[in-house]
């Protein structure tokens, strides 16, 4: 067995059943080539232009972070179009099985939307309105130094047959959050702002933006899962938006722009699936 370098341990696991809504924290998760089962399994699609709703354009979708989604039956969360429950800002709940689900969501958002699903069954076959082509979405770029665009909205394509922005797994270390907090002490650099799947507590002595050094390497998590770290995670306006008790704070993004090339965390592809659990060790395998 090749020597592996201990990097840390998994301290939290997250998935987001509906794109850009609040998600759910897990004790364990099954990982397939399409990421954590059930992650971004659903999305809202604009009834007028057919684009996927995302908080990346808060001017168009200012309320998405006020909605929360969870799977009704965790045992079925890997099944195609497994039913979910969505809690609206006023506390009303609606399930994906209700015939009037999209109508209820449309009224809450004051915009016609359709709740669409990407199938995540055993065959990992997409079953949505976008099975063979990339869905499109929009991103608003605030007027901020260091961004590729400023004070404008651009279109981007999601990976074919998915509702992910870029990659199927997103990792983040507590060391990065701690470092950002040192650079901007008034900012609340909490996991919720960055929406990762896997949060890693580094081994003793690990500080700073340490996951930057993982790019190009393979990570072993627990006994089964292997991830190939493909690149850094570029951040956007979503990190600045209010959610729950977190206030709007543009300096969250500005701090990342000034000190880490607008990057927080890393993306990964799945080399080998399996189950990961809170507390699992994270090692560099290659």
Regions found by a protein language model. Give the residues of each.
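Metal-cofactor-dependent catalytic cores
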Residues: 1-286
């Amino acid at each position: 067995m090749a020597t592996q370098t201990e990097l840390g341990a998994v301290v939290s696991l997250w998935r987001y059943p509906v794109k850009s809504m609040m998600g759910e924290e897990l004790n364990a998760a099954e990982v397939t080539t399409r990421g954590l089962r059930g992650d971004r399994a659903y999305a809202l699609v604009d009834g007028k232009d057919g684009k996927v709703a995302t908080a990346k354009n808060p001017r168009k979708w200012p309320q998405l972070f006020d909605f929360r989604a969870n799977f009704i039956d965790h045992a079925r969360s890997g099944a195609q179009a497994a039913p979910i429950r969505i809690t609206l800002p006023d506390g009303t709940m609606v399930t994906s099985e209700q015939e009037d689900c999209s109508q209820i969501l449309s009224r809450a958002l004051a915009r016609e939307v359709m709740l669409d699903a990407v199938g995540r069954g055993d065959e990992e076959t997409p079953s949505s309105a976008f099975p063979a082509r990339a869905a499109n979405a929009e991103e608003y770029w605030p007027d901020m130094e260091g961004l590729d665009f400023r004070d404008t909205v651009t279109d981007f394509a999601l990976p074919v047959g998915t509702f992910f922005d870029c990659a199927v797994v997103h990792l983040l270390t507590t060391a990065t959050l701690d470092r950002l907090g040192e650079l901007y002490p008034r900012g609340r650099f909490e996991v919720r702002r960055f929406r990762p799947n896997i949060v890693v507590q580094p081994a003793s002595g690990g500080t700073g933006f340490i996951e930057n050094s993982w790019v190009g390497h393979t990570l072993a998590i627990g006994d089964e899962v292997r991830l190939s770290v493909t690149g850094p995670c570029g951040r956007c306006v979503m990190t600045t938006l209010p959610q729950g008790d977190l206030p709007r704070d543009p300096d969250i993004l500005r701090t990342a722009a000034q000190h880490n090339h607008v990057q927080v965390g890393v993306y990964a592809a799945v080399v080998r699936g399996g189950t990961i659990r809170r507390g699992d060790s994270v090692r560099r395998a290659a």
